[in-house]
Amino acid sequence: MAVSASPVISATSSGAGVPGGLFRAEPLYSTPREPPRLTPNMINSFVVNNHSNSAGGGGRGNTNTNECRMVDMHGMKVASFLMDGQELICLPQVFDLFLKHLVGGLHTVYTKLKRLDISPVVCTVEQVRILRGLGAIQPGVNRCKLITRKDFETLFTDCTNARRKRQMTRKQAVNSSRPGRPPKRSLGVLQENARLLTHAVPGLLSPGLITPTGITAAAMAEAMKLQKMKLMAMNTLQGNGSQNGTESEPDDLNSNTGGSESSWDKDKMQSPFAAPGPQHGIAHAALAGQPGIGGAPTLNPLQQNHLLTNRLDLPFMMMPHPLLPVSLPPASVAMAMNQMNHLNTIANMAAAAQIHSPLSRAGTSVIKERIPESPSPAPSLEENHRPGSQTSSHTSSSVSSSPSQMDHHLERMEEVPVQIPIMKSPLDKIQLTPGQALPAGFPGPFIFADSLSSVETLLTNIQGLLKVALDNARIQEKQIQQEKKELRLELYREREIRENLERQLAVELQSRTTMQKRLKKEKKTKRKLQEALEFESKRREQVEQALKQATTSDSGLRMLKDTGIPDIEIENNGTPHDSAAMQGGNYYCLEMAQQLYSA
């Protein structure tokens, strides 16, 4: 990588000379591939300002380590510093430019650096300021690391190899499968199948099954199962009759996502119409027997069944069915699709067996006589009774390839009275619409002796299944309405219970307030009684003291009486009465106190 001659950008410890236009609110690297937007005017202004600052400051910093150069790396301009003779580049800048789309984040890069034994250099404050001014790092970042070119190339190679390994592992997990089991389908594969299925096979799903947002998961799963069951049924029927001994794998359908062309070619090579032998002659004879139909190709039901096998448009699903609304539940749709798959597989097996049966080739005995050496397998088949169709039993044995055994077999077939279906003219067949045409594998329409009974039966069964699904949907809707009514009644009951509880709570709160008021009154009366009791106790003490004094005065009177002083007796005549009155008042107070305590 050639280093381009770029201007040297230096800085000092003061950042006053940096223009304000270099600091941006938005990050410069919005995408991994976007280079830093450095115009020549910005670089020149930055250089002039920094040279003026360095001339005025007198070399206050180490200019050797703070000289920033814009070097060319993988076609991008990257900021670099020259330290100890090594060129170091900004690690966050090269991460945004080259590594962001390869790894999960910058922490993954640091983990890889530890594993690779690479030690990045931590930037100084001046270097961080320079890188921030150039826009190499975010405006709010105050830390940065530098890495050499050699270490970056090692890191870039490791990240690229790791991503390639992840992609190869993911592809192997999608494409590989164990015998007898389909490959694991990831979410992305299912979404890709859903996207391609609507374009590659337009008539495979009814428009009623496709919601406004896309194909539902149940419908997608049933459609994939339908394709796989068809392919497996045809491989089972054609396994013994194929000449080259090649069998198609059921998993090819899943590995070839949306590839309708390759799967069509493969089915065309293995279809009973392209098998070598008498059937190929039947096809050409049928083609030769139609001189100019007038540009309106026809298809009988057997050919339509074969088209179903080759994953083409379903004749009964090309138009939206009136019994299939969009709002059907997924369970009913899945059940109906499962039954349709089963019935369709049975119809395809019966159609293929009729193609291989000897009675379908009875009208072409001339072709058999012309090529008597070609092998003609004739498996035995017993058809079940179908409504609206003729009941016939076919009995045949294995026919050898020698001419004598062939003639003997033809004689036995002539002896057995079997009603051979009459070949109908092409005008009596079902005609395609003007917008429809045969695929590339069919050069012209085919004629086979078959009736519409199988398709009618299949359509009748499908209609019945759709009716059942619709009835189930209606029943579920009724159940939902009934549940809604029950929930409403229960809600009303809960509301009534809640209102009753609220009333009871209000009554209880009111009674609580009344009880609190009564309690306050009782406390007030109790306080008054205690005060009265204290007052009475004090009076009692006073009365007792007075009684004591009265007793002492009585003893003094007696002494005076003994001495014979009459005046003192006259003065003290009223003292016994007074003491009796005082005792009576004391008893009254005690009775009042007892009454208060009892109350």
From Swiss-Prot:
Signal peptide: none annotated. Its main location: nucleus. One of its GO terms (molecular function) is DNA-binding transcription factor activity, RNA polymerase II-specific. The keyword RNA-binding does not apply. Transcription factor that is involved in regulation of organogenesis. Seems to be a regulator for SIX1 and SIX6. Seems to act as a corepressor of SIX6 in regulating proliferation by directly repressing cyclin-dependent kinase inhibitors, including the p27Kip1 promoter. Is recruited with SIX6 to the p27Kip1 promoter in embryonal retina. SIX6 corepression also seems to involve NCOR1, TBL1, HDAC1 and HDAC3. May be involved together with PAX3, SIX1, and EYA2 in regulation of myogenesis. The DACHbox-N/DD1 domain forms a structure containing a DNA binding motif similar to that of the forkhead/winged helix domain. This is Dachshund homolog 2. The lineage of its organism: Eukaryota, Metazoa, Chordata, Craniata, Vertebrata.
